[in-house]
Amino acid sequence: MLSQFFPHIKEKPLSERVKSRDAFVYLDRVMWSFGWTVPENKRWDLHYKLWSTFVTLLIFILLPISVSVEYIQRFKTFSAGEFLSSIQIGVNMYGSSFKSYLTMMGYKKRQEAKMSLDELDKRCVCDEERTIVHRHVALGNFCYIFYHIAYTSFLISNFLSFIMKRIHAWRMYFPYVDPEKQFYISSIAEVILRGWAVFMDLCTDVCPLISMVIARCHITLLKQRLRNLRSEPGRTEDEYLKELADCVRDHRLILDYVDALRSVFSGTIFVQFLLIGIVLGLSMINIMFFSTLSTGVAVVLFMSCVSMQTFPFCYLCNMIMDDCQEMADSLFQSDWTSADRRYKSTLVYFLHNLQQPIILTAGGVFPISMQTNLNMVKLAFTVVTIVKQFNLAEKFQ
C-alpha cells in the first residue's frame, strides 16, 4: 500500500540499476526543501542561500525565542498540564536547533561519504550482492517514511487534543497577536512552525540511522567476500592475492565512509543523549499526574518519537561492532593455510586491522551503544523519583 505512494521503499528488481546513495532519496528531498544542501542549477544559488538563511533564522533562533518569551510573559496562565506539555517539547526543541545546525553544517562530509559508497558499489557485480544492496536501499528509504509517519502522528494528535479544548498546544509568543481573541490564527501559526521544527528534527534523527544501515550493508558484503577467499580452484596465487587486496581496499573505503560521518553524528547524538533522560522524565510525570486520555495519547507518541531518536541508531552501532569481530573470524576461517608467503603476510596485517572495532562516540565522550542509551534513559526514572519524593506534582495541581 505505502509503496504505491513511496516507490523507493520497495526493493527494486535487478533489471534496474540502484546505488547505495539512493537510500537517501526521501531524506535528501526534505533536506533540500529546508536549504540544507545546494541547488542543482547554480543560477538559483543566491535565492537558495537566502531561503536557507530565512529558514535558519526562523526555526533555529526565532522559534526558541518565541517559546521562551511566552514562558516569561504568561507563565502564571499555564496550567500544570499545559506547562509540562510545553516544556517537554520546548527542551527537545532547543536541542533540535543544535542538532539541525550540526546536520546542516555536515553537508560536505555527507557528500564525501557518498563518494565512498559509489566506490563500494563498483564491487557489487554479481546478482547476489546487488540484491543485498537493493534490499538495504529500500530499507533506508522505508526508515525515513516510517519516522515521517510517526512524527506526523505526534504532531497531529498533539495539536488536535489541545485545540478541541480550545487550548494552545505549544504556547508560542507572536507579536501583535492576541492568543485568546485570535485563537485559531495563532494555533495555525503554531502548528506550521512546530511542523517545520519537527521535520527538521526528523532529518537529524533519520540521517545517522540510514547511514549506518548502508554501512552495515557493505560490511555484510565484505564478510561474504572474506568467507569466499581462495574458494575458487584453478586460480593463480597472484589472482588470490589481488582478491585479498580488493577486500583490504573495501575495508578501507568502509572506514573512510564512517570517518567522514563521525564528526557529523558525534555532536547530534551527544545533544540527544543529554536531552533524552530529562525529556522522557517530564513526559512520564505529565502522563502520571496531569494528562487526560486525549493528551495522554499525544504524550505517549511523543515519548515514542524521542526514544526513536537514539535507540535504533545505538542498536545498529552495537551490531556493527559485532560485525567487525565476525569479519575477522570470516577471514581467519578462510582457506589461507596453503597460500604463499605474500598472501599470508598481507592476511596477518589485514586481520589485525579487522580486529579493531568501528566505534562511534557522542561528543568524543560517550561510546554510542545500547548500554550508553540505557544509562541515559535511566535519568528519566530519576526525575520521576524526585518529583514523587518531594510531592511536587501535588503542589502544581
From Swiss-Prot:
Changing V30L: In strain: NC52a and NC73a. Changing L102F: In strain: MA45, MA50, MW37, MW6 and MW9. Changing R194M: In strain: LA116, MA13, MA18, MA43, MA45, MA48, MA50, MA7, MA74, MA8, MW25, MW27, MW29, MW3, MW32, MW37, MW44, MW46, MW56, MW6, MW7, MW9, NC21a, NC52a, NC62a, NC73a and NC79b. Residues 71-85, 165-194, 290-295, 369-397 are extracellular. Changing T220S: In strain: LA116, MA45, MA50, MW37, MW6 and MW9. It is a multi-pass membrane protein. GO terms for cellular component: dendrite; dendrite membrane; membrane; plasma membrane. Changing G267R: In strain: MA45, MA50, MW37, MW6 and MW9. Expressed with Orco in 20-22 sensory neurons on the medial-proximal edge of the antenna. This expression pattern matches the distribution of the large sensilla basiconica. Expression is first seen at 60 hours APF in a subset of cells restricted to a subregion of the developing antenna. Expression continues throughout antennal development. Expressed in the ab3A neuron which responds to ethyl butyrate. Belongs to the insect chemoreceptor superfamily. Heteromeric odorant receptor channel (TC 1.A.69) family. Or2a subfamily. The atypical heteromeric and topological design of the odorant receptors appears to be an insect-specific solution for odor recognition, making the OR/Orco complex an attractive target for the development of highly selective insect repellents to disrupt olfactory-mediated host-seeking behaviors of insect disease vectors. Odor-evoked OR currents are independent of known G-protein-coupled second messenger pathways. This is Odorant receptor 22b. It comes from Drosophila melanogaster.
